[in-house]
Amino acid sequence: MKRIIKTITVLLLLTACSKDHSDFLEGVTRQAAVTYLVTPNGLGDNGYNDAAAQGIFSFIIETFTPVRMLQPQDTTQAEQMYRQWLTDNADKDSAVLILGSSVYEQMARRVPVTLFGKGSRVLLFESSARIDGLSTVKVSRYGASYLCGAMSGGFDALVLSAVRNNPLLDESIMGFMAGYNAHHQEGKNAQVLYLADDESGWAMPDSAYRMMARRIRSSSTFREMVFPLLGGSDIGVLRAMNDEQNNLGLVIGMDVDQSALSPRVPFSMIIQTGQVLHDYLKDWLSGRDWPASRTLDMSQGAAQIMLHPSFYRHNTLMDYEYRDPDTFLNLYNRFIDEAVSKEQEYENN
C-alpha cells in the first residue's frame, strides 16, 4: 500500500508539472529536487524519450525524490526554461537539472552555469562534450549500429534519419554503414535518406508514414531492412510497415524493444537510456561526484541488440529465408565480437 501511495503521489506531481513553464507555481517549484528538461515534443515517442522518463520515474519511486518535467514546444522555449531554472536554483542545495539530449548542447555551451548551492548539478545527456559547469554522458551507438548493419547484409538497406548533421545520428549512420559495407551480399546496397533539414524531423510521424508507404508501393516486392533514426517519427515507419500489402521488408526496433508495435521487427537496438539516468541520479543522491564527461558503450551493456522470438511466432508472410528461427541469432553470434572491437577502435581514434 505504501508503494501504491508513493506512486500515486509521484504521478500527481508529474501531472501537475507537465504544463507550460508559467504554470509551475510555488508549491511544486520549491519542492522539486530533480528537473528533467525533455527534448521538444519528445514524450510519447515509444522510444528514447519515454525510456529516459521511465528511468527517472523508477528513481523517484525508489527514493521518493520530488521531480518535475519541463516539456518545451521548441528549443527557444527550452532555453527560456533553462535560464529560469539556473536563476531560481543559483543558491539552492541539491538541485539537479537533466538536459534531455544533445539537442541542447549548443544551448549548454552558450548559457553559463553558475550554481553556488551544495550538491547542485546540471547533466547534459547524449553528449560527450566538455562544458564548464556541467557534466555530460553519452551512450555510444557506433558498435550496436555496426552490428545492425552487419546483420542486415542480406538485404538492401534503408537508413532513415530524422535530421542532417546531428552528431549522435551521424555516429549511428557511420556505424551501420561500416558494418553493412563490410558484410553485405553481392548486389545489395544501402541508402541514407533524411526526413527533414531541421529538428522538426523528430516529430513528423505522418511524413515518415507517407515516405515509407510510397517506397513500399513503388516496388512489387519490397524487401529492404529499415534502420530508423527518427525519434517520435519512428511510429510512422512502423505503421506503414504494418499497413502496406506485398511488403517483405523488415524494420529494426530503435532505442527500446519495439517488437510489440509490428510483426516486421526481428530485433531491436536497445539503448539503456533510463538505466543510465537512474544510476546517475542514485550517485548524486549518495553524494558521489559525476565525471566531467563519460561515454558508455556495448562492452558496458549500455547498448545492445535484443532478438525477438515473437518475430517468428507472428510472422505470417511467406518469408522463406526466415523459416529457420535461428537466422538472426546466428548473424548476431557471428558479428558481435567484431562489433565490440570496431566500437573500441572508433572511440580510440
Q: Where in this protein do the model-derived segments appear?
A:
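Extracytoplasmic "Venus flytrap"
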Residues: 33-54, 59, 70-75, 102, ...
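Extracellular/periplasmic Venus flytrap/periplasmic-binding protein
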Residues: 170-222
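Hinge/cleft segment of the Venus flytrap/periplasmic-binding protein
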Residues: 279-349
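An alpha-beta-alpha
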Residues: 56, 146-192, 293-317
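Hydrophobic alpha-helical segments within soluble ligand-binding/sensing domains
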Residues: 137-157, 270-286
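C-terminal motif of bacterial Sec signal peptides marking the signal peptidase cleavage site
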Residues: 14-16
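Flexible loop/hinge segments that line or gate small-molecule binding clefts
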Residues: 116-139, 256-262
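Periplasmic-binding protein-like
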Residues: 92-102, 125, 159, 220-231, ...
